[in-house]
Regions:
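N-terminal nucleophile
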Residues: 1-305
Length: 305
């Protein structure tokens, strides 16, 4: 269960949010339920939000202030034990510790594993030293940790027990001015996207301002649908769907929930081909409109042309 991401650098908060969102869009399994999201703000103060259900999409309107260069999140299925803050530890001016599996379990130090790693950091240990100490001293505990310090140093690792699993997710990139690490398990991906490679690419592009091979678009509000000789989607500069053309001879028909963003559809922006849909969106189709439905993910992945 669970995915954890920590990042440092330009727009670290956005990078983490988009990393979890991309995991929800591209993956299936233990995702899209509870979320804990933490940042060290522009003053180094620890700020945290959490929710039990709905995944990162439910934080879509979260007001992320500028100046955040240190951020972390943990997410999995819904309805985890309260308080959700136990799953992600943070301290003003010091850093954040997230993870996957059960990072809040009590370890050999008598503290929760994530809090114990944070305490080691407070005593002067680098993040990778703090994480290695926890995994070495608790080899059969069911956890992996990612620690990020306020100065940008990142450490991550799994216990020996977790490392024996055959469903692990791990991707990272650490450089002087920016870095991130992502750990997860029990999440299975769309093969067209090279799974976690695409997610890491999206995170890195946000951290550094570089271009990614893929991007996330959304049917965030009702969009007009028309009969067309070929499928197409038009999006705006922010990735929102402006209109959809359908060559499917079944439509128009009775109103209902169906695939309105279809895998392989060409995506257009400002009269230029922007890319190709990698994932689908199911929504209510009727009265000439595709309307997002609360029971379905409304974001979708696009491979750039």
């Amino acid at each position: 269960m669970t995915v954890g991401i920590a990042a440092y650098g330009l727009e670290a908060g956005r990078a983490v949010l988009e990393g979890v969102l991309a995991t929800e869009v591209l993956g299936r399994g233990s995702i899209g339920g509870f979320v804990v999201f933490s940042v060290l703000d522009e003053h180094g103060q620890h700020q945290q939000v959490s929710l039990q259900c709905g995944g990162i999409t439910a934080l879509d309107d979260f007001d992320l202030r500028p100046g955040v260069r240190c951020a972390a999140a943990i997410s999995s299925g819904p309805n985890r034990p309260e308080p959700l803050s136990q799953f992600l530890a943070g301290r003003d001016g010091l850093g954040l510790v997230t993870g996957h599996r059960l990072p809040q379990r009590i370890g050999s130090s008598g503290l929760p594993l994530n809090s114990s790693a944070l305490e080691r950091m407070a005593q002067g240990h680098a993040p990778h030293e703090a994480v290695q100490s926890e995994t070495k001293e608790n080899p059969e505990a069911d956890f992996g940790l990612i620690a990020v310090a306020a100065d940008g140093k990142i450490g991550f690792g799994n216990s020996a027990r977790v490392q024996r699993r055959v469903d692990l997710l791990e991707v990272s990139r650490l450089e002087k001015e920016a870095g991130f690490a992502m750990l997860g398990n029990s999440i299975y991906f769309n093969n067209a996207c090279r799974d976690h490679v695409a997610i890491g690419d999206l995170i890195w592009s946000r951290l550094t301002g570089s271009s990614s091979k893929n991007f996330i678009a959304k049917l965030g509000r009702p969009a007009p649908v028309s009969v067309s000789e070929e499928d197409w989607i038009e999006i705006d500069d922010d990735g929102g769907v402006l209109g959809i053309g359908r060559a499917d001879p079944w439509w128009p028909a009775a109103e209902g929930i169906t695939s309105v963003v279809y895998s392989g559809m060409p995506v257009w922006r400002n009269s230029s081909l922007a890319g190709t849909c990698l994932t689908e969106v199911f929504a209510t189709l009727g009265n000439g409109l595709a309307t997002p439905h609360a029971s379905h993910q409304y974001h979708f992945a696009v491979r750039r042309s």
